[in-house]
Amino acid sequence: MTTVLDRVRTAARTRVLYLPHAVKQMALPERLISAAEVEDVVLHGEILEDYPEDVRGHSCLLMGTPRGRPVHVVCSPRAEYLAIITAYLPDLAKWSPDFRRRSD
């Protein structure tokens, strides 16, 4: 059985498409998240949340620590490509200290 993480990584090896929202969020001066960091999260990170019923299509939230900092990436695997919906640096006010669970 193919997992969503397998589908994400297979799609990423085919082609990666950064949606406009992702590009805008990655370019914010306080974030400056590179495409290399996003690709590191996609290829080596872990799934934190799975959104099978997302209106944009099945998507998920991944986390990794490229360059020693936590990065969250929301992406959606498609047959022809991996859509990067957004990428951001998680905020301790909204996430647990390990950045893996949302705060209450």
What kind of feature is each model-predicted range?
Residues 1-104:
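Ribonuclease/tRNase effector modules and their secretory precursors
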